[in-house]
Amino acid sequence: MQKVNKKTNQNLKDIDFSKDIILDNVSYTYAKKTPFEFKALNNTSLTFKKNKVTCVIGTTGSGKSTMIQLTNGLIISETGQTIVGDYAIPANTKKIKEVKRLRKEIGLVFQFPEYQLFQETIEKDIAFGPVNLGENKQEAYNKVPELLKLVQLPEDYVNRSPFELSGGQKRRVALAGIIAMDGNTLVLDEPTGGLDPKGEEDFINLFERLNKEYKKRIIMVTHNMDQVLRIADEVIVMHEGKVIAIGSPFEIFSNMELLTKIEIDPPKLYQLMYKLKNKGIDLLNKKIRTIEDFAEELAKVLK
């Protein structure tokens, strides 16, 4: 683990939140000292790199969702520390200074965020976060039409009730509310769960755009390996409360021993490549993300 200057008491307005987010030897236990005690994280460390898309994978109960909640202080580690842009949150910290600023910069989107909508209009729901953090109310409201456009909803939806929308539309509104806070990092827990294929594609396109055009760091927990292959710069593999592997999607998905251990099937393209390998055509050492990449590499081999 890299050495970090601890600045626990530094004013958060002085922190550069674009720097790496480091979880250093962190642990977390649910229902401590009860018959239901469960150690979700067990003295593990990792880094979420600047301007990267990082996907976190692993079976249910491996610690993925617990780990991402440490990034913005929603929960506090029992050991080690969480470091955000040189700002250290030591284990068992009771109160984080200026926690609103921290949560502005690191926006956490839970699975099924549409259940967090509560305002009477879409405009008020999207503007709620920025206004709550001190932004001028009119300025926050003025941004809403552009945010609706970004998440592919009509701009004239501003005065509609969010409860009139479909599930997928509600999720777009909820995501727009997080983006409205204009933080450096989006932390997403199963963001496309329950969406139809068109909705999934729209969301993945949006995350790619937020990373490439808006320079947002994206941290995404998902069980959808096709999405991981499509979007990830780096993949973190969790198992029984620990990080057991970190690598590019190409490195992770070409390691069948690892995938078998964590009981995860590779993306569909890699399933096809494993079948081809059994037929004597090995493409697993190629950096293949899309069906177009696959066709190009296969054509080279078959020439």
Curated annotation (Swiss-Prot):
Cross-referenced Gene3D superfamilies: P-loop containing nucleotide triphosphate hydrolases
Top-rank lineage group of the source organism: Bacteria
Keywords: ATP-binding, Cell membrane, Membrane, Nucleotide-binding, Translocase, Transport
GO-annotated molecular function: ATP binding; ATP hydrolysis activity; ATPase-coupled transmembrane transporter activity
Binding annotation for ATP: G58, T59, T60, G61, S62, G63, K64, S65
Listed GO CC annotations: ATP-binding cassette (ABC) transporter complex
Subcellular localization(s) per the UniProt record: Cell membrane
Major enzyme class: translocase
Family: Belongs to the ABC transporter superfamily. Energy-coupling factor EcfA family.
Assembly and binders: Forms a stable energy-coupling factor (ECF) transporter complex composed of 2 membrane-embedded substrate-binding proteins (S component), 2 ATP-binding proteins (A component) and 2 transmembrane proteins (T component).
NCBIfam families: ECF_ATPase_2
PANTHER family (UniProt xref): ENERGY-COUPLING FACTOR TRANSPORTER ATP-BINDING PROTEIN ECFA2, HEAVY METAL TRANSPORTER
Name of this protein: Energy-coupling factor transporter ATP-binding protein EcfA2
The organism's taxonomic lineage, starting at the top: Bacteria, Bacillati, Mycoplasmatota, Mollicutes, Mycoplasmataceae
